[in-house]
A protein has these predicted regions:
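OB-fold and OB-like single-stranded nucleic-acid-recognition modules
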Residues: 18-115
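Sec-dependent bacterial lipoprotein signal peptides
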Residues: 1-23
């Protein structure tokens, strides 16, 4: 019985460690906007409320406001609706254009979670 408890504790600790190392830490948007070169081509996580969105045929861009600033997120999935709370992770890029509109610094989404 003691061996089973030890194995369970070990698996829980191992799973937690893997989850923490696999996820990028959440970064506030003001830091990204203040120094986008520091974050360029690095994976970051952000979370906030969707304030604007543009979608075309399953792709698009949406803007997240985390209370410290706003940033556009480029997605190959459908865009979330305005007012939604989401968490997104991806890579920071500059000079992004979509449907003839320039978005400046953007997060290229690799994963999204609704809150």
């Amino acid at each position: 019985m003691l061996a089973l408890k030890k194995a369970t504790v070990f698996l829980v600790l191992l799973s937690g460690t893997l989850l923490l190392t696999a996820c990028p830490s959440q970064t506030n948007i003001a830091k990204i906007n203040r120094d986008p070169d520091h974050y360029r081509n690095k994976e970051v996580g952000i979370a906030g409320r969707v304030t604007d969105s543009y979608g075309v045929m399953g792709t698009g861009a949406y803007e997240i406001d985390d209370g410290t600033g706003k940033i556009w997120v480029a997605t190959k999935q459908g865009v979330p609706s305005r007012g939604s709370r989401v968490g997104a992770k991806g890579y920071i890029h500059s000079g992004f254009s979509f449907a003839g509109r320039s978005f400046g610094t953007v997060l290229e989404e690799t994963d999204r979670r609704s809150k």
